[in-house]
Amino acid sequence: MYDDYFTFRSVTTAMRGSRILEAMGIQSLTVRTPKQLQQQGCGYSLRVRGDTAARAKHALKQAEIQYSRIYRKDENGQWREVTE
């Protein structure tokens, strides 16, 4: 199983997103964004299970919670941006 990381520029926005996901029954964990993924800002992410990522993306968009990008670590340990 893989995890997806929704990156945010602020911890406040990440925590707002976490509350939205919790209300929708989607488990998430607020974590520091891995250094290699940080673009700018303080670098926090919501880590969600890959099988709930599509629902999480939809819930965040519906609630107008703006994330920066979504990343997933592949089987070789390389990070890639999720664009689907």
Please name every model-derived segment.
Residues 1-2, 84:
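Absolute protein N-terminus
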Residues 2-22, 26-57:
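Amphipathic, hydrophobic secondary-structure cores in small proteins
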